[in-house]
Amino acid sequence: MGFSGWSPEAVEFFQDLQTDNTKAYWSAHKGFYEASVREPMAELLDELSGEFGPGRIARPYRDIRFRADKSPYKTEIYATLDRGGYVRFGADGLTAALGYYMMTAAQLERYRQAVIDDAHGAWLAELTERLRADGLQVGGGQMLKTAPRGYPGDHARIGLLRCKGLICWRQWPVAPWLHTAGAKDRVTGFLRTAAPLQQWLDQRVGPNPA
């Protein structure tokens, strides 16, 4: 059929799951989840795959082994794209993102060397400002409180140096277009606009081989 958005009932499903995160609720609504939540995500990923690579949908079950919150089910559905990209749908709307959420020690060292490079670092700083001017969010996930060891605390790009990851994202609240095929246009537009950040990271840092 092709992607046609998520229904208002899919939004309500996650709203109800937030208040009744139990096996009984999940079992009673699993068929709805598969048909009206997961299947639209799979259709969206299929339509994005030609430009952004295959996607993988995360399992709906939370890992609760070391968590105080023992709620068994995720109150959202999300997927990752092979060429960089993340799509999430939940009761609060739709989110698209890309970048490196958490870098390894080796990645961080390559990243920091690129940030202090006069050409590569300045280009990245200008890019992040352009993305923010376009209404996108850019941040480092977890941030160091001070400069990383061995790097000057007064560096012109200290904000970027303090990042332990670097991601760009946009979140849209629930609106009528979310229930239509137009939701794909929002995701596609974001991924194209933010693509230079993913390309910079892939070229200057490189993905985690693991």
What residue ranges belong to the model's regions?
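Charge-dense, helix-prone N-terminal extensions
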Residues: 1-210
